[in-house]
């Protein structure tokens, strides 16, 4: 008998469970009677959760979703241990920030961003699909407002989130015949530690006072806009998971619903003008014009 065959609880897999949203959703699922495989590259934070909630509610598993071979190994582990081969929930939450001017993002930075934010989630869905179909389960993605609005200095991250939004929407259609729900949680401001700590490259075309000021305003965007506490976000999302409704997109987090309507009713040129002012790109523009004028004089 496998380790879980006597376990009547619903079973979930959560990636990126070592902090922020994934950590809080893991706890909220455990409170709602799930056994959660809490997956992340770092086991230490999740080990504390296993102690707090008990090993019959949270089981830490070391997993780097940017490595396809680790996902295949994890799938084999689940095949050997899931009761009746059923997985009730896959929460694709692991994420990689990438905050750079578009022209400064290196091949390595772009590749890592897409490996985690896109390819890793696609691989998880493919490798775990048989368990989810058997359970008539639910697949959830942590989407982002950045996948709807391309904020300055975040074009690579925005591209990765836009890609996973479209994947989720296609998957939502394709999984309906198999009675598997797919939820894309388009996420606004949430208090997490995902913010990119890497500095502006010295060779950047934005490496002058006004450019650095604009870049720094983008890096502090989340904490400057009253982000929703991660535990409050988790409670909302778990309600969505437990619901029987089947929308593909749900909007959660600070400003998420506001931006949803902004994108419908506000012309993009006007939104772009607002973003330019908010992130101080108007100052960059003025500084460059002044510099050019001085050259011409």
From Swiss-Prot:
<keyword id="KW-0442">Lipid degradation</keyword>
<dbReference type="InterPro" id="IPR020904">
    <property type="entry name" value="Sc_DH/Rdtase_CS"/>
</dbReference>
<dbReference type="GO" id="GO:0006654">
    <property type="term" value="P:phosphatidic acid biosynthetic process"/>
</dbReference>
<dbReference type="GO" id="GO:0000140">
    <property type="term" value="F:acylglycerone-phosphate reductase (NADP+) activity"/>
</dbReference>
<feature type="binding site">
    <location>
        <position position="93"/>
    </location>
    <ligand>
        <name>NADP(+)</name>
    </ligand>
</feature>
<comment type="similarity">
    <text>Belongs to the short-chain dehydrogenases/reductases (SDR) family.</text>
</comment>
<dbReference type="InterPro" id="IPR036291">
    <property type="entry name" value="NAD(P)-bd_dom_sf"/>
</dbReference>
<feature type="active site" description="Lowers pKa of active site Tyr">
    <location>
        <position position="161"/>
    </location>
</feature>
<feature type="binding site">
    <location>
        <position position="126"/>
    </location>
    <ligand>
        <name>NADP(+)</name>
    </ligand>
</feature>
<feature type="binding site">
    <location>
        <position position="190"/>
    </location>
    <ligand>
        <name>NADP(+)</name>
    </ligand>
</feature>
<protein>
    <recommendedName>
        <fullName>NADPH-dependent 1-acyldihydroxyacetone phosphate reductase</fullName>
        <ecNumber>1.1.1.101</ecNumber>
        <ecNumber>3.1.1.3</ecNumber>
    </recommendedName>
</protein>
<dbReference type="GO" id="GO:0004806">
    <property type="term" value="F:triacylglycerol lipase activity"/>
</dbReference>
<feature type="active site" description="Nucleophile; for lipase activity">
    <location>
        <position position="18"/>
    </location>
</feature>
<keyword id="KW-0496">Mitochondrion</keyword>
<keyword id="KW-1000">Mitochondrion outer membrane</keyword>
<dbReference type="GO" id="GO:0005811">
    <property type="term" value="C:lipid droplet"/>
</dbReference>
<dbReference type="InterPro" id="IPR002347">
    <property type="entry name" value="SDR_fam"/>
</dbReference>
<feature type="active site" description="Proton acceptor">
    <location>
        <position position="157"/>
    </location>
</feature>
<feature type="binding site">
    <location>
        <position position="21"/>
    </location>
    <ligand>
        <name>NADP(+)</name>
    </ligand>
</feature>
<feature type="binding site">
    <location>
        <position position="64"/>
    </location>
    <ligand>
        <name>NADP(+)</name>
    </ligand>
</feature>
<feature type="binding site">
    <location>
        <position position="157"/>
    </location>
    <ligand>
        <name>NADP(+)</name>
    </ligand>
</feature>
<dbReference type="GO" id="GO:0005741">
    <property type="term" value="C:mitochondrial outer membrane"/>
</dbReference>
<feature type="binding site">
    <location>
        <position position="192"/>
    </location>
    <ligand>
        <name>NADP(+)</name>
    </ligand>
</feature>
<keyword id="KW-0560">Oxidoreductase</keyword>
<keyword id="KW-0472">Membrane</keyword>
<dbReference type="GO" id="GO:0005737">
    <property type="term" value="C:cytoplasm"/>
</dbReference>
<keyword id="KW-0443">Lipid metabolism</keyword>
<keyword id="KW-0256">Endoplasmic reticulum</keyword>
<dbReference type="GO" id="GO:0005739">
    <property type="term" value="C:mitochondrion"/>
</dbReference>
<dbReference type="GO" id="GO:0019433">
    <property type="term" value="P:triglyceride catabolic process"/>
</dbReference>
<dbReference type="GO" id="GO:0005783">
    <property type="term" value="C:endoplasmic reticulum"/>
</dbReference>
<feature type="binding site">
    <location>
        <position position="161"/>
    </location>
    <ligand>
        <name>NADP(+)</name>
    </ligand>
</feature>
<dbReference type="Pfam" id="PF00106">
    <property type="entry name" value="adh_short"/>
</dbReference>
<comment type="function">
    <text>Can convert acyl and alkyl dihydroxyacetone-phosphate (DHAP) into glycerolipids and ether lipids, respectively. Required for the biosynthesis of phosphatidic acid via the DHAP pathway, where it reduces 1-acyl DHAP to lysophosphatidic acid (LPA). Also has triacylglycerol (TAG) lipase activity. Involved in the mobilization of the non-polar storage lipids triacylglycerols (TAGs) from lipid particles by hydrolysis of TAGs. Required for spore germination. Plays a role in cell wall biogenesis, but this effect may be indirect by affecting the activities of cell wall synthesis enzymes.</text>
</comment>
<keyword id="KW-0551">Lipid droplet</keyword>
<feature type="short sequence motif" description="GXSXG">
    <location>
        <begin position="16"/>
        <end position="20"/>
    </location>
</feature>
<keyword id="KW-0378">Hydrolase</keyword>
<keyword id="KW-0521">NADP</keyword>
């Amino acid at each position: 008998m496998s380790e879980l065959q006597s376990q009547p609880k619903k079973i979930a897999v959560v990636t990126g469970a070592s902090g922020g949203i994934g950590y809080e959703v893991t706890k909220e699922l455990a409170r709602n009677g799930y056994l959660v495989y809490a997956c992340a590259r770092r086991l230490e934070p999740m080990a504390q959760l296993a102690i707090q909630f008990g090993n019959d509610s949270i089981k830490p598993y070391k997993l780097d979703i940017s490595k396809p071979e680790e996902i295949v190994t994890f799938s084999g582990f689940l095949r050997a241990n899931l009761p009746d081969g059923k997985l009730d929930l896959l929460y694709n939450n692991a994420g990689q920030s990438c905050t750079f001017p578009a022209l400064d993002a290196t091949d390595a930075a772009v590749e890592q961003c897409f490996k985690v934010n896109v390819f890793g989630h696609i691989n998880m869905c493919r490798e775990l699909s048989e368990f989810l179909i058997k359970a008539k389960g639910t697949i959830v993605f942590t989407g982002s407002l950045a996948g709807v609005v391309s904020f300055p200095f975040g074009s690579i991250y925005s591209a990765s989130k836009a890609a996973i939004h479209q994947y989720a929407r296609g998957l939502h259609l394709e999984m309906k015949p198999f009675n598997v729900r797919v939820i894309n949680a388009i996420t606004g401001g949430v208090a997490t530690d995902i913010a990119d700590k890497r500095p502006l490259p010295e060779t950047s075309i934005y490496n002058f006072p006004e450019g650095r000021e604009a870049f720094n305003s983008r890096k502090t965007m989340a904490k400057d806009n009253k982000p929703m506490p991660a535990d409050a976000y988790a409670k909302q999302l778990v309600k969505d998971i437990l619901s029987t409704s089947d929308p593909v997109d749900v909007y959660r987090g600070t400003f998420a619903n506001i931006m949803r309507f902004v994108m419908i009713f506000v012309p993009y040129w006007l939104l772009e003008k607002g973003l330019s002012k908010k992130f101080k790109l108007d100052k960059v523009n003025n500084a460059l014009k002044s510099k050019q004028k001085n050259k011409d004089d």
